[in-house]
From Swiss-Prot, chain A:
<dbReference type="InterPro" id="IPR000515">
    <property type="entry name" value="MetI-like"/>
</dbReference>
<dbReference type="InterPro" id="IPR035906">
    <property type="entry name" value="MetI-like_sf"/>
</dbReference>
<keyword id="KW-0029">Amino-acid transport</keyword>
<comment type="similarity">
    <text>Belongs to the binding-protein-dependent transport system permease family.</text>
</comment>
<keyword id="KW-0813">Transport</keyword>
<feature type="transmembrane region" description="Helical">
    <location>
        <begin position="25"/>
        <end position="45"/>
    </location>
</feature>
<feature type="domain" description="ABC transmembrane type-1">
    <location>
        <begin position="21"/>
        <end position="216"/>
    </location>
</feature>
<dbReference type="Pfam" id="PF00528">
    <property type="entry name" value="BPD_transp_1"/>
</dbReference>
<protein>
    <recommendedName>
        <fullName>L-cystine transport system permease protein TcyL</fullName>
    </recommendedName>
</protein>
Swiss-Prot record, chain B:
<dbReference type="InterPro" id="IPR003593">
    <property type="entry name" value="AAA+_ATPase"/>
</dbReference>
<protein>
    <recommendedName>
        <fullName>L-cystine import ATP-binding protein TcyN</fullName>
        <ecNumber>7.4.2.-</ecNumber>
    </recommendedName>
</protein>
<keyword id="KW-0813">Transport</keyword>
<dbReference type="GO" id="GO:0016887">
    <property type="term" value="F:ATP hydrolysis activity"/>
</dbReference>
<keyword id="KW-1278">Translocase</keyword>
<dbReference type="InterPro" id="IPR017871">
    <property type="entry name" value="ABC_transporter-like_CS"/>
</dbReference>
<dbReference type="GO" id="GO:0005524">
    <property type="term" value="F:ATP binding"/>
</dbReference>
<dbReference type="GO" id="GO:0015424">
    <property type="term" value="F:ABC-type amino acid transporter activity"/>
</dbReference>
<comment type="function">
    <text>Part of the ABC transporter complex TcyJKLMN involved in L-cystine import. Responsible for energy coupling to the transport system. Is also involved in cystathionine, djenkolate, and S-methylcysteine transport.</text>
</comment>
Length: 239, 259
């Protein structure tokens, strides 16, 4: 039974929910870390057009970008025990936290791969040629010359990915993870004040997202300071 | 020292190089001139295998590389003997001037950082940029960028320096400072192959001038032979058109017959 709207409850809920923010951030950090590394390995065959692996990467990316994150969560959550069961390991009692991290990592990898690929594509081919011309090997040219510039190019998109991934983690409660949203669900059950809980949740998520956005904006400015870019009239301060 | 035999290159149906032969002795300056699309840049890029010829042989120091199927090792080896200066500079945008010059030393040649720094600083002094060591490419003028490009190529002490139209992208006012640096390099006795539109430069510093058109070498020889005692009509036509006087010549006389 829903109770009458009570503004004061929001203020009470915010600190209760914020106490679970570390869990949310933990899922986010781990999944971004693993996702980024996996994304790099997915991007490489796409960039270098390596036969077969390229097709597999394409299918992988397309699948994870084309299915809802909640469906992916359940597939991984039920899929891991089913898979490990085949080799006789029982993981059905596994903490759903790990399934959530795995899902978000797999999903972030698909997004990261496309972002990295676009970043590498935006680096002038001449950079690679110049690296070759002074005797760098293919991998040296990629690691030392192309990738650093590609990551700078990709940085704004990475920022967007982090923020959208933060919002995605709010679905982890559906497989029973006790993160901020999970705690929100239990608060609703115990208090019968759904609206207040959701408003409190939105306040915390929004605050974190704004903080991230600010951080990425400042970081981007610092990183781009030394990069070559074409200065247009739009960059000039005309008063 | 360098012998290049029968280089062929095709882009799709477009036959860009139709069997180029060239011998370059140690300390020689070879300039390649010719109209756009004649294949001169492609030929130069074949020499460090940035472009893979369909056929041909490059030998340096008695080491013979079959360009059709070079091994990774051969490609890498060849690139270590050569260095290229690009029309669009291609400085590493995320590295400072000194880091740009050090890169080929510390990474490709495993030189110690302090030693590489000393070499790079010295090369940058030669091109007059000793006070820009810590600047980023985006903070330099075109002429300064190209001088860094030259220092980067010089630093690795290649057997042969390849210049791909090094002044073509520069403001007219900045061409001089780059050519000046190149003249200094000529004086050191470096082996150079230069693709250029700077005819006066070609005329004055070359030991050998090569005129290319439509994928073949039309004419080659000393500057005296090519510029003064031109043998082929196509060369004469090209030289006339690039000469400053061309614009003011009475055009009625040189109209080509319409077939």
């Amino acid at each position: 039974m829903e109770k009458a709207f009570d503004m004061n409850m929001i203020g009470d809920f915010v600190p209760t929910l914020t106490a679970y923010l570390p869990v949310t951030l933990y899922i986010l950090t781990l999944s971004l870390l693993f996702g980024f590394v996996l994304g790099l390995f997915l991007a490489l065959p796409r960039i270098y057009n390596i036969p077969i692996v390229n097709q597999l990467a394409k299918v992988y990316i397309s699948f994870f970008r084309g299915t809802p994150i909640m469906v992916q969560l359940f597939i991984v959550f039920y899929g891991i025990p089913a898979l490990t069961g085949l080799i006789g390991i029982d993981t059905s009692k596994m903490d759903p936290f790990y399934a959530a991290v795995a899902t978000y990592a797999l999903s972030n990898a698909a997004a990261a791969a496309e972002i990295i690929r676009a970043g590498v594509g935006s680096v002038d081919k001449g950079q690679t040629e110049a690296a070759y011309s002074i005797g760098l090997s293919g991998s040296q040219a990629f690691r030392r010359i192309v990738l650093p510039q590609a990551l700078v190019q990709a940085f704004p998109n990475m920022g967007n990915m982090v923020i959208s991934s933060l919002k995605d983690t709010s679905l982890a409660f559906s497989i029973g993870v006790m993160d901020m949203s999970g705690r929100g669900q239990t608060l609703i059950t115990s208090s019968n004040h759904s609206l207040e809980v959701y408003i409190a949740l939105s306040i915390v998520y929004y605050a974190v997202a704004v903080l991230f956005e600010w951080f990425f904006r400042v970081a981007e400015k610092r990183i781009k300071k030394n990069q070559t870019r074409i200065v247009t009239v739009f960059d000039m301060n005309i008063h | 020292m360098i012998e290049i035999k029968n280089i062929h290159k095709q882009f799709g149906i477009h036959h860009v190089l139709k069997g180029i032969n060239l011998t370059v002795r140690k300390g020689e300056v070879v300039t390649i001139i010719g109209p756009s699309g004649s294949g001169k840049t492609t030929f130069l890029r074949c020499l460090n295998l940035l472009e893979r010829p369909d056929e041909g042989i490059i030998s340096i120091h008695d080491k013979v590389i079959n360009c059709r199927f070079p091994s990774k090792k051969e490609v890498h080896w060849l690139r270590k003997q050569t260095a290229m200066v690009f029309q669009q500079y291609h400085l590493f945008a995320h590295k400072t001037v000194i880091e740009n010059v050090m890169e080929g030393l510390t990474i490709a040649r495993k030189m110690r950082k302090q030693d590489a720094y000393a070499v790079a600083e010295n090369e940058l002094r030669k091109v007059g940029l000793q006070d820009k060591l810590n600047a980023y490419p985006s903070q330099l003028s075109g002429g300064q960028k190209q001088r860094v490009g030259i220092a980067r190529a010089l630093a690795i002490h290649p057997d042969v320096l390849l210049f791909d139209e090094p002044t073509a992208a520069l403001d007219p006012e900045l061409v001089g400072e780059v050519l000046e640096v190149m003249l200094e390099i000529v004086k050191t006795g470096a082996t150079m192959i230069v693709v250029t539109h700077e005819m006066e430069f070609a005329r004055r510093v070359s030991d050998q001038v090569v005129f290319m058109d439509e994928g073949v070498i039309v004419e080659q020889g000393t500057p005296e032979e090519v510029f003064r005692h031109t043998k082929k009509d196509r060369t004469r036509q090209f030289l006339r058109r690039v000469s400053p006087e061309y614009l003011f010549e009475p055009k009625e006389h040189i109209k080509e017959p319409v077939i």
